[in-house]
Regions:
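The feature marks short-to-medium sequence segments in extracytoplasmic or secretory-pathway proteins
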Residues: 577-627
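Short coil turns that delineate tetratricopeptide repeat
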Residues: 88, 122-123, 157, 163, ...
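Alpha-helical repeat scaffolds
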Residues: 73-80, 108-119, 142-157, 182-194, ...
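TPR alpha-solenoid repeat register
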Residues: 93, 127, 168, 201-203, ...
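Structural detector for internal amphipathic alpha-helices that build alpha-solenoid repeat scaffolds
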Residues: 96-103, 130-134, 171-175, 205-212, ...
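Low-complexity, acidic Ser/Thr/Pro/Gly-rich terminal tails and inter-domain linkers that flank the onset
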Residues: 503-562, 693
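N-terminal leader/linker segments that initiate helical-solenoid repeat arrays
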Residues: 14-96, 103, 107, 112, ...
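Short beta-strand elements
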Residues: 661-707
Length: 851
């Protein structure tokens, strides 16, 4: 059996390790193996508490430097390796260790530790994939790697989860392409898409590969829908589907997907692409008719102006000065919409509509030109003189062309055209087309026809030729020409204009032509409308496809102890009718922000950076109705340190959980298609030693269990550091420290490490340099190694001299890394303050300054 629980006959050499050579020395093995097992529950509790405390220190150490480098990650990995050795069954600590080793660039360690993680969580398909991929990559030859992939994709891998095999198939496909085997690439890529519909990378690659090799619009749409199935909320894919449908004349389906794209943009709070907005309006024109489009565009802007006028009147009545009031005429349609309204009005042929549309369009363009001439506006847009000049030229060309097409203000348009013709940036073909159309509007049809035919297949030139036929009274000829344009350029403004004119002429001529969708457009519409309509519902409400629950798991006693871990149980369920990918950027978002509310007594703690992030990507996907339940460590980091240092009052902790979180005006909120929730609360009472006398604490140090000693040590820290009446005297503090130092050598390794991880070091409390000195001379290398990394603030410390570790490579490397980091003036847990830091800089992450 594999560690992943799959009954496979392993390919020879795939995962095998040399049997004659012991494993390489690692941070978790050198000098760190317990002399004897510790089956005693009390001893296991001490080890677990020490592991958790060390993990907190490692995470805090990383946070002290905004951008940790490989050395920072390596040191954190050494601490986490110690923690994982103390509690080898703690998957949360092991995951942190793997992450740190990855940041340190230790790929071999990531591979080894991932195998360990798979033993703890055999259902973790993300780790399964990583372990198998790493094993295959160990083959030196490409042919060997490809053969290994194929064995996993054959009968030997039949028990692997399909989501894992799908990604292995994709990797194999890419390897085959690298070898020049295009047929093998295509075969394995197809297998990848068939094994797991949520494999978006495979679906996207299949689209790119197969679409480039076919002119079949139906096939391209099917490939696009495959990508949509892999990620139903990818707005770029949704837009691509809308465009594919529109350019093939399948406007019913196109309208649906452009509307879906609009919905996704609104949910994400992003503006629609301007080109997509224009395309959506063309589809609107084609599905609802030119007159409907004109009426709704006009109503929208007129309603906007009416509301602006009402606001103006209300402000005026309130005494606002006239020059500060909004101008209703400043409310304009975008230039692209103005253009379409002019074209639709021309296509309909109503003179009053054309006059109004052209007048509005000219006013919009003139206002745009005036705005861009304002120097402040140019600075806001980052436009230089050249960019401004080009903007003015483009706007003039837009106005000139539409006036010519509409047959309005031809003399003014002719003057502007002459000016445009002299501009080097103006395309000569645009000039030729506009000159030909100007001749159409002036009745010079023969000359115009000659010039337009020279432009060959340009759509607007073809529209001009159809217009000439219409003006000559050749209705059926014009009708056929318009239909040809509409079929050749569906979804474009020219195609929309041509189809509208064709429909009008066909009706006038007694319907000699049957105007309907092409066979291809009908098939595409059927495919598009066959996509289940609950897809849009999923986008609008995450409750349509997932449920998320999170609860703090209460300890057996019902209340947290001072050194207990805070565990949150998370349940994520796919409630949709389709498989959904799980991950940080997948439909089921795996990133959770845990925002705690901590009440100490009756006061709510206000402290920055209490929140933490967890990633629950233990699966590549969840099938319909499948639920994943996992436990995550909720108190690793700032909250854990707060629980350790606050002893005299009871603490209540609850969390707000934000899935796929994002920042909005300085506040965190759940991301698009994501959920948020509030957990239950858990109570941690005040410490039993919070108000103990110095003699009582000294007695615990002398006779107490390791857990009692640790809790009493925290109480000592609290009472020595406080400024209140409960503060111990200097003599009492000295006596307590003496007692603790007497007990320290007699504690187990776990007990020593627990104390070293929870007590302040000498940077935070000067008197602790005595403990640090004892610890750096301890006979246990693991105790010394942790002391090096977490408690020694000076490069001249005895344990940081490489000369002390001749023959012990790991200890020497650790000493060198810590010493170099200190010399580089990096903030560390052992030395969180640097010269020049403010006096109130915390002495440890998220902790109060030392008293």
């Amino acid at each position: 059996m594999l560690a992943c629980g799959c009954a496979l006959s392993l390919p020879a050499g795939l995962w095998a390790q040399p049997s004659s050579t012991p494993p390489a020395a690692t941070p978790a093995t050198v000098g760190s193996q317990p002399a004897t097992p510790a089956p005693d529950p009390q001893q296991q509790r001490v080890a677990a508490a020490a592991a958790l405390a060390i993990a907190r220190v490692a995470q805090a150490d990383l946070r002290l430097n905004g951008g940790p480098d490989e050395r920072d990650f390596w040191i954190a990995a050494q601490m986490l390796g110690i923690a994982s050795t103390l509690n080898p069954k703690d998957a949360d600590i092991l995951r942190l260790l793997i992450e740190a080793e990855g940041g340190a660039g230790e790929s071999d360690e990531v591979d080894r530790l991932s195998r360990r993680l798979l033993e703890l969580d055999p259902q973790d398909t993300v780790t399964q994939l990583r372990v198998i991929s790493d094993a295959i990559s160990n083959h030196q030859r490409v042919e060997g790697r490809l053969a290994a992939y194929d064995r996993f994709l054959g009968q030997e891998g039949r028990n692997l989860d399909a989501s894992v095999r799908s990604r292995l198939a994709l990797d194999a496909a890419l390897l085959a392409r690298e070898m020049g085997d295009i047929e093998g690439f295509a075969r394995r890529l197809t297998m990848a898409t068939e094994l797991d519909k949520t494999n978006k990378d495979a679906a996207t690659l299949a689209l790119t590969f197969f679409a480039a090799r076919t002119n079949d619009a139906v096939g391209r749409l099917e490939l696009l829908i495959n990508v949509l199935v892999a990620d139903p909320f990818d707005q770029d894919v949704v837009l691509a589907i809308g465009r594919e449908l529109s350019t093939q004349g399948a406007f019913t389906g196109a309208a649906r997907f452009y509307a879906y794209y609009q919905t996704l943009c609104a949910i994400r709070g992003v503006e629609m692409d301007p080109l997509a907005t224009n395309e959506l309006q063309v589809v609107d024109w084609m599905t609802n008719g030119a007159q409907s489009f004109v009426d709704r565009a006009t109503s929208a802007i007129e309603d906007d102006r009416a509301e602006t006028m009402r606001q103006r009147e209300r402000a005026k009545a309130a005494g606002v000065e006239e020059d500060q009031l909004p101008d209703p005429q400043s409310r304009r349609l975008p230039v692209d919409t103005e253009r379409l309204r002019v074209l639709a009005s021309i296509a309909i042929g109503r003179a009053d509509q054309i006059d109004y549309a052209v007048r509005e369009m000219n006013e919009t363009i003139e206002r745009s030109k005036a705005e861009i001439l304002d120097l402040h506006r140019q600075q806001e847009l980052g436009m230089d003189e050249k960019a401004v000049k080009e903007f003015l030229r483009v706007m003039t060309q837009e106005s000139t062309w539409l006036r010519i097409w509409a047959g309005r203000d031809l003399d003014g348009a002719a003057r502007d055209l002459a000016q445009l013709k002299s501009e080097p940036a103006t395309d000569p073909r645009d000039v030729q087309r506009m000159e030909a159309w100007l001749k159409i509007r002036r009745g010079q049809l023969d000359e115009a026809e000659t010039e337009l035919r020279a432009l060959k297949d340009e759509s607007l030139a073809q529209v001009g030729l159809a217009t000439i036929a219409e003006l000559r009274g050749r209705t059926v000829e014009a009708l056929d020409q318009y239909l040809a344009i509409a079929q050749r350029a569906p979804g474009s403004p020219a195609g929309a204009f041509a189809l509208t004119r064709a429909e009008i002429l066909n009706e006038q001529a007694g319907a000699p032509r049957k105007i309907e969708e092409s066979a291809t457009a009908k098939r595409l519409d059927a495919l598009a409308l066959g996509v289940p309509d609950w897809l849009e519902g999923m986008a609008e409400s995450p409750l349509e496809f997932e449920t998320l629950q999170a609860d703090i798991v209460p300890p057996e006693s019902g209340m947290l102890g001072v050194l207990d871990r805070l565990v949150m149980r998370v349940r994520l369920r796919n409630t949709s009718r389709m498989p959904l990918g799980l991950g940080p950027d997948r439909p089921l978002n795996s990133r959770l922000l845990l925002v705690p509310t901590v009440r100490v007594g009756s006061e709510t703690v206000r402290r920055p950076s209490l929140h933490g992030v967890v990633n629950i990507d233990r699966r590549l996907r969840l099938m319909p109705r499948e639920e994943m339940t996992i436990n995550v460590l909720a108190d690793n980091g700032a909250v854990g340190l707060l629980l350790q240092e606050t002893l005299r009052d009871g603490i209540n902790v609850r969390y707000r959980v934000l899935q796929g979180f994002r920042s909005n005006r300085g506040m965190f909120e759940e991301g698009p298609q994501c959920l948020s929730l509030e957990t239950n609360g858990v109570m941690r009472p005040s410490s039993r030693y919070a108000y103990a006398t110095a003699s009582e604490l000294e007695s615990v140090f002398d006779k107490g269990s390791p857990m009692e000693v640790a809790e009493a040590a925290l109480a000592m820290r609290d009472r020595v550091g406080t400024a209140s009446a409960e503060r111990f005297s200097g003599e009492e503090a000295q006596s307590l420290l003496d007692a603790l130092l007497r007990r320290f050598p007699h504690l187990s390794r776990d007990g020593k490490l627990l104390l070293l991880a929870i007590l302040p070091n000498s940077s935070a409390m000067t008197a602790m340099d005595r403990l640090d000195d004892v610890a750096q001379h301890d006979p246990d290398p693991m105790v010394v190694r942790f002391t090096m990394m977490a408690r020694l603030p000076g490069v001249d410390a005895h344990a940081l001299q490489e000369s002390q570790w001749i023959g012990n490579d790991l200890m020497a490397r650790t000493a060198k890394a810590v010493r170099e980091r200190l010399a580089d003036n990096r903030r560390t847990f052992a030395r969180p303050r640097l010269p020049g830091d403010a006096a109130d800089t915390p002495s440890s992450p998220d902790a109060s300054p030392a008293k």
